[in-house]
């Protein structure tokens, strides 16, 4: 961490876990296992030490959002309208964004039992493969130019205004957008938006996605650790793909282990590391909270914007 984070307060895990006094995790070990991504590692103790204090912090921000909305409505002499509380979660490929997002969705559902808590990933706003091929962008998939940012911003605008919104659905099994399939959202109380690009902005857009966020999280780790996690995840995906000839990764499933590792390492260095260093990591100081992971996936440091 550098002077880039002068506006953040660094909090150790030991200090952070004292910010929530309850010892009950609100979910079972089986539930935790079911939402943990391939090769990620999270324990009930992590839920208690890290995520329960985080739920408390989100509640602080939600109350502040509601109070501000109420006061603005009075000032403008307009009817009071409760808007969805939107949480953005960003970080590198293979850093554990999906696990964090699903865990927060579950915990928010448990702590706000009468609330609708939804989750959307920005993968659905990638351009379809055919379009990327036609534009010569398939090898840039995941980079800023491969996303339909206008559609994504329109989606967030509809959500923020309490309107029904629809998001395309992406499948990692086919490595593409699923044709004619949409995920619908009808004015949820909470919306979690997860993706590598949630703090980014293309040059031709005046809006940032983060303009719509009420709270935001960046999952951080040393790039050498993320590389290891990426390769481990790739090998796990290949094991699963052996059982499904229609899976996109089935074409790599018969590679000898050494070749599979070499292939994954090359993809990491030529695609994912470049994307991380040029476009993802430089946006992390836009987050309200940074969760830093050590080599064993455990969150060891927390950075909260002052």
Swiss-Prot record:
Residue intervals passing through the bilayer: none
EC number(s) per entry: 2.7.1.33
UniProt keyword Plastid present: no
Gene Ontology CC annotation, any one: cytoplasm
SUPFAM superfamilies according to UniProt: P-loop containing nucleoside triphosphate hydrolases (SSF52540)
Class of enzymatic activity (EC top level): transferase
Main location: cytoplasm
GO terms of molecular function: ATP binding; pantothenate kinase activity
GO terms for biological process, alphabetical: coenzyme A biosynthetic process
Record keywords: ATP-binding, Coenzyme A biosynthesis, Cytoplasm, Kinase, Nucleotide-binding, Transferase
Pathway named in the protein's UniProt entry: Cofactor biosynthesis; coenzyme A biosynthesis; CoA from (R)-pantothenate: step 1/5
Origin: domain of life: Bacteria
Subcellular location: Cytoplasm
Gene3D superfamilies hit by this protein: P-loop containing nucleotide triphosphate hydrolases
Alphabetized Pfam families for the sequence: PRK
Signal peptide per UniProt: none
Catalyses which reaction(s): (R)-pantothenate + ATP = (R)-4'-phosphopantothenate + ADP + H(+)
Residues noted as binding ATP in the record, renumbered to the chain: 91-98
Family the UniProt entry places it in: Belongs to the prokaryotic pantothenate kinase family.
The protein, known as: Pantothenate kinase
Encoding gene per record: coaA
């Amino acid at each position: 961490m550098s002077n880039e984070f002068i506006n953040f307060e660094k909090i150790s895990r030991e200090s952070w876990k004292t910010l929530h006094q309850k010892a009950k995790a609100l979910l079972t070990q089986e539930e935790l296992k079911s939402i943990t991504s391939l090769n990620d590692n999270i324990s009930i103790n992590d839920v208690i030490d890290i995520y329960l204090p985080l739920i408390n912090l989100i509640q602080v921000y939600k109350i502040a959002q509601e109070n501000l909305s109420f006061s603005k409505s009075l000032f403008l002499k307009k009817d009071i309208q409760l808007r969805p509380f939107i949480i953005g979660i960003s970080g590198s490929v293979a850093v554990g964004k999906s696990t964090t997002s699903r865990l927060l969705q579950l915990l928010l559902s448990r702590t706000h039992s009468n609330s609708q808590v939804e989750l959307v990933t920005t993968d659905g706003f990638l351009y379809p493969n055919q379009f990327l091929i036609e534009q010569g962008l398939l090898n840039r998939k995941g980079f800023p130019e491969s996303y339909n940012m206008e559609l994504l911003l329109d989606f967030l605008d509809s959500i923020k205004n309490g309107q029904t919104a629809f998001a395309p659905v992406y499948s990692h099994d086919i490595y593409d957008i699923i044709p004619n399939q949409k995920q619908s959202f009808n004015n949820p109380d909470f919306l979690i938006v997860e993706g590598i690009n949630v703090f980014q902005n293309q040059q031709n857009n005046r809006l940032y996605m983060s303009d719509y966020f009420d709270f935001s999280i960046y999952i951080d780790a040393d790039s050498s650790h993320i590389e290891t996690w990426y390769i481990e995840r790739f090998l796990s995906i290949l094991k699963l793909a052996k059982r499904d000839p229609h899976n996109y990764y089935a074409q790599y499933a018969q590679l000898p282990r050494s070749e599979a590792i070499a292939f994954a390492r090359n993809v990491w260095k030529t695609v994912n590391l470049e994307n991380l260093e040029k476009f993802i990591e430089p946006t992390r100081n836009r987050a309200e909270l940074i969760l830093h992971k050590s080599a064993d996936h455990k969150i060891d440091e927390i950075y909260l914007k002052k």
